[in-house]
């Protein structure tokens, strides 16, 4: 799961878009180990928002943005967060294994 998320973030970065933070949503996001490892692998702060209807909210906000041309404000209340500097070796080992071709792409 986190490998695919890291690949997605890398693809976004390859397009010149800065990834400043990642929101983890879903059952696995509640696991503190997943939060910590995600921050290391993605090398950005990871936030777990309070429970909510984020998929529906996101779709509605995108529709409003497309129709109005104005980006809607979206405040997310935080349930938990993890910074990427907790265990730097995790991210380093992940990137080294990926560079060697040891991880699927």
Residue ranges with predicted function:
Residues 1-105:
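Glycine/Thr-rich phosphate-binding loops that ligate phosphate moieties of nucleotide
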């Amino acid at each position: 799961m986190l490998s695919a998320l890291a690949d997605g973030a890398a693809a976004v970065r390859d397009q010149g878009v800065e990834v400043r933070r990642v929101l983890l949503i879903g059952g696995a996001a509640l696991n503190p180990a997943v939060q910590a490892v995600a921050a290391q692998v993605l090398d950005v702060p990871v936030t777990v928002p309070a429970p909510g209807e984020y998929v529906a909210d996101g779709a509605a906000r995108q529709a409003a943005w497309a129709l109005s041309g104005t980006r809607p404000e979206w405040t997310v209340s935080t349930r938990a967060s993890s910074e990427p500097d907790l265990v730097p070796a995790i991210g380093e080992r992940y990137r080294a294994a990926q560079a060697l071709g040891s991880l699927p792409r």
